[in-house]
Amino acid sequence: MGRKWNNIKEKKAQKDKNTSRIYAKFGKEIYVAAKSGEPDPESNQNLRLVLERAKTYNVPRNIIDRAIDKAKGSDDENYDNLRYEGFGPNGSMLIVDALTNNVNRTASDVRAAFGKNGGNMGVSGSVSYMFDHTATFAFEGKSADEILEVLMEQDLDVRDVVDDGNLTIVYAEPDQFAQVQDALRQDGVEDFQVAEFEMLPQNDIQLSDEDKATLEGLIDALEDLEDVQNVYHNVDLDS
């Protein structure tokens, strides 16, 4: 569970740094979700899920409203979801998810970030087979045993429920996101530290301090790109 817990800590840390970048990325994602269907979360499941995730990052209401209003208007900006896979130092693997209105620009920017920061791009499928697409929830106030019983009563067979420090963490199938979150809310969970879709590595690796510094520079360069939404990797940065 080490890598998964590190991933939770990284998600929590992201909330405390560069919030304007996080808000901008959610604004784009909310716009795309609202544009793809009705701009109402009650009738648009994709929009509802994005808004639920945005809550855990405290995305301001005005940013959410602006994105939805833009989707309601005559704006016809089209975005594509893209995934890039690549390698960092000494066997480290990275997945980069992007949302872009200019595929050529994004591909060039991502390739340059890899090349200038000790990494190299891979082909589609070269890395992703070592990761699992997962719905992840983290919250306080309930034990893993309590939550497991609640989920079993709802016939929700999730991947894992663990206690770690003061948090309880639930790992579920991606298509269980809404059902699991609803079940947790019904049991009294109101505040989620994490409620996200993630690509979790099946195994984590350890790097030397020098290689970790190189990897962190690569991650920062990728996350700073306007079109990049998420960067996942298979390294235990706390070891």
From Swiss-Prot:
Going by the UniProt record, its keywords in alphabetical order are: Cytoplasm, DNA-binding, Transcription, Transcription regulation
Please state what the protein is called: Probable transcriptional regulatory protein Sca_0317
Entry's localization field: Cytoplasm
Q: What is its main location?
A: cytoplasm
Q: Quote the InterPro entries the UniProt record gives.
A: Integrase-like_N (IPR017856), TACO1_YebC-like_2nd/3rd_dom (IPR048300), TACO1_YebC_N (IPR049083), Transcrip_reg_TACO1-like (IPR002876), Transcrip_reg_TACO1-like_dom3 (IPR026564), Transcrip_reg_TACO1_YeeN (IPR026562), YebC-like (IPR029072)
Q: State the similarity comment.
A: Belongs to the TACO1 family. YeeN subfamily.
SUPFAM superfamilies noted in UniProt: YebC-like (SSF75625)
PANTHER family in alphabetical order: TRANSLATIONAL ACTIVATOR OF CYTOCHROME C OXIDASE 1
For this record, an example GO cellular component is: cytosol
Which HAMAP family does the record associate with it?
Transcrip_reg_TACO1, Transcrip_reg_TACO1_YeeN
Q: Name one GO molecular function term.
A: DNA binding
Q: Pfam families, per this entry?
A: TACO1_YebC_N, Transcrip_reg
* Swiss-Prot/TrEMBL GO biological process terms: regulation of DNA-templated transcription
